[in-house]
Amino acid sequence: MQSAKFKSVNNKVDFVQLEHEMLAKWEKHTIFDRLRKKNKGGEPWSFLDGPITANNPMGVHHAWGRTLKDIFQRYHAMQGHELRYQNGFDCQGLWVEIEVEKELGFKSKRDVQEFGLEKFVNACKDRVHKYSDIQTEQSKRLGYWMDWDNSYFTMSDENNYTIWAFLKKLFNDDK
């Protein structure tokens, strides 16, 4: 019996280079856009990405979660479903505020008042935008397909007004 011969492979694979080559190939051939076009009009399947907080670069646990979410979306895309691919960023105040307070060297909430509430809120928003950009690039490097130009932010006026309207309705309905 003759044994099978396999082509030699390099045992020092540059995975980062391979990753960049694959991402460049997808971009060059507009693979994601072609998939969306192919599935347009298919049965809708919606997946709301439970957002990670845009407060620091992604951790390995975020990458793991995003990879699992991507598997579900790719499966449904392969079934011909039309997907929204909407990414989100959680802008919850507490964790962002804590990091901004550290950056500014604040020791108490009184420091925030002295600094100025509006300036502090703007510093928090700037941090969210900085890290949402970083997380977007990290997610793209994972091969995570999303409509990156239409990500939602929990700090958006639309989101806040919707929450306030909902809370008002609950209050008015006495529930």
Feature map (PLM): residue ranges:
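N-terminal, positively charged nucleic-acid-binding surface of large information/translation enzymes
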Residues: 2-175
